[in-house]
């Protein structure tokens, strides 16, 4: 007798072992038709999985997130099937699920063209309509190697040869195609109805630039056509908002080959940067942080003591001078510990909060670089809090409150919080980890926020809270972190004198709110589509004259605004006013002031707000008050 507990708490009993598909059929024909897989005691399996002992079972359908992952994984295999069918000489490699879709890497003797993608997608649709059953078989490693070698698939054979000889290998087949995979997969190809191939890109075998270059075909797959259409519309909107395009259009920054992964900030872009940095500086100063500055280049010995040289060396830029090895800092924490160590600290000094807009450099691979989002040189709004064990909960509460307030000011109202818990390989005792994890839970509870827990995702030296902001397109970006560190203070000899005169290690909290300033500015630009709120806009107002007779008046207006701290420019060119308005509208300036003879004589201005909104004619003082209220509403 096999007892199966369902999600609603009910229990079904079966005389003999049953498959997930048979359980679904016993519940009802609708569920049997909808079943894509199952979860046996939390493990995702195929509908063909046999149940021969008492378990908890959930039937997975397209309504579940796991169901969508199964569909996308199976669609990746369908893509490989279609490519092999159309181009038999192509070799398959790997094809995982990624956010919003999947990809598959191929080795082929010529580049795939857009016309090829159309042809492949059409063939995928034809194969899906055949509704071929998907079968799974388990073989030994050596059997799998021999099979893929026999059909000329050297990449698959190489993958399997790297697997321990004692491991069993799962092979999935549909029609004339067989692939290596952990699974699970849909029961038949007819379940794959909504998909689209997106693009082709280059990739290296096993991600190593020393290996052969492959072709990566990206695709997306969904359970409903309307979901796919919404996603494709989002991509179109994202293309319009691309910070690289807007950076050029708005004259904010540029990048060039002579300095890969580094940013050339133009005047307006640097003005935007300064608004963000000065805002952050005010907020951390108000929160009791002490701003410091640490060297960009430090001796190898310090990086060895911190552990970075051993564990992060390949991502560090290094140099040599006078027979000494140095590294350009990839992060600020070792330098902050040096400031803490400079002098004897007492428990009365704690908590000590050190903040730095620290310039860091990391040797990211050239293929990973992406505009402002992934750079080699960046500035972090970094800070480290040195505190006692009794203080770290209150410090965590204060940080969470500050971070959530900052995100709201920048226009991010939806923030997801994740708590990464202890990994298998870790420093410290279970008791220490228990206190650390529970302390962070207590802090988040006190803040009234909800969070998702990620078992095993913490760093080896402590648990971490992550802050993921959602932008206007619903995309999630991890920005803030609060990382508890139980290792670095010991490695670098940080200590304080406790109340009983003993020497103790401080708790160290690494924290950032926006993270990389470059990346955050890229997110901001895309979130606001370049139309920054008035308090952030690099140019808040442009004053324009209609004719030369108003030049002096327009200049005086601009000067008056500038004295009030407004970021303003005067456009006095001998151009049609419609041309000027259009040009500055494309620059996404929040307010345009137009002056003609009537406005000059009445000492007023005609005001146009961004979006072409005519606010009418008003005295300059009235406009300044309106602008002030606009700025204060955001900040």
Swiss-Prot record:
Domain TGS, first and last residues per copy: 1-61
InterPro entries from the UniProt entry: aa-tRNA-synt_IIb, aa-tRNA-synth_II, aa-tRNA-synth_II/BPL/LPL, Anticodon-bd, Anticodon-bd_dom_sf, Beta-grasp_dom_sf, TGS, TGS-like
Domain of life where this protein originates: Bacteria
Required cofactor names: Zn(2+)
UniProt keyword list: Aminoacyl-tRNA synthetase, ATP-binding, Cytoplasm, Ligase, Metal-binding, Nucleotide-binding, Protein biosynthesis, RNA-binding, tRNA-binding, Zinc
Binding site for Zn(2+): 333, 384, 510
Record-linked SMART domains: tRNA_SAD (SM00863)
Role description: Catalyzes the attachment of threonine to tRNA(Thr) in a two-step reaction: L-threonine is first activated by ATP to form Thr-AMP and then transferred to the acceptor end of tRNA(Thr). Also edits incorrectly charged L-seryl-tRNA(Thr).
Protein name: Threonine--tRNA ligase
Protein species of origin: Paraburkholderia xenovorans (strain LB400)
Gene: thrS
